[in-house]
């Protein structure tokens, strides 16, 4: 081994298997687990390469195995590797607002370098138990089905569950639109292993709506961190931690209330499974990594509210093959305060948002938190829809005419409720042509109260489809006659 390696803490690449690198160091100079290593060299075409990787395993004989955060094409055995002596560290604070970063904390929005004042390592411990905040309050989203049946907790963790193409990203974009704009604090968005086009659409939408202020970036209310589908698995596995580190700084140092959006937490698990296989670990159930629960817990326990400030997290969760018992969504369930489950059956009927009112849950749905009126209204909706679900087999075989008068009334009201739970979204105006609607919780409860009081039994059910509050449904019914 050459003198250069003896004098500096440098190593050499001895093996490259896709994004996994084996690197040998001088005796006594082996880097710690999670240390960042950098490779700066020229490839065979003479192009400058800058690759960062993270130590994952110590193999013995002064050799470590690291996972790359960048593409490894062009790397060769024998190239020099420098140990930075610390974990990946990313910029934090006001300088991150209005900018798009990659997993390494480098800006990728072609708007110049960031004046880095402070950096923090992406691997940090969760807040101590005694520092946690346990106050209970809900926050309004302006989306009827969510506010009524599965209300979100301020400073809690919320999961949006759904298979492919049922509307998770549109729902998360609407929540950003409704909450982030009215929200006094800051938001951090982590794009984990999703489409580049969606990230670009979100960025453009935020600039148009004033959430990102291009002329004075420090007035912006959001920081974006992207690691798209085409990134190596190491980057997709760590990008959520990069974004979370930025969010934690706003909470702990600036003492702000932070909204933290992740789209999609399943891709974090998926990337972890890829890395686990590349590192040669024995897979567990359905091919997932054996460390699935540990990795998920390590991320989720850091997303919490302390006495200094809060992080309210909204996470989209892809459900493979619509199977909620799959280990990835099942592990995520354990950490959440509210679950919004999207249904393919409702999406097929054209009811958007396709939120399943019976599957979606919230720990906040308690009479002593919400008040009796809200709680009773939510339970009446669930009871009616559950009875309608039970009657569907009878209707399919014998028809509506065979039902009792009481059951026919339940079916009629349930169909109106199902349609009234749909709503036009601001972010979907370009697809639907209908202007978006924000419905306050009071208006939502009032609307369902009128349906159950029988005041609207004579209105056609299509009057309730894709409207905002109940007044709109009544005026739509008048125009249908």
From Swiss-Prot:
It is found in: Plastid, Chloroplast thylakoid membrane. It is a peripheral membrane protein. Disulfide bonds: none annotated. GO terms for biological process: proton motive force-driven mitochondrial ATP synthesis. Gene3D superfamilies: 2.40.10.170, Bovine Mitochondrial F1-atpase, Atp Synthase Beta Chain, Chain D, domain 3, P-loop containing nucleotide triphosphate hydrolases. Coiled coil: none annotated. Belongs to the ATPase alpha/beta chains family. This is ATP synthase subunit beta, chloroplastic. It comes from Chlamydomonas reinhardtii (Chlamydomonas smithii).
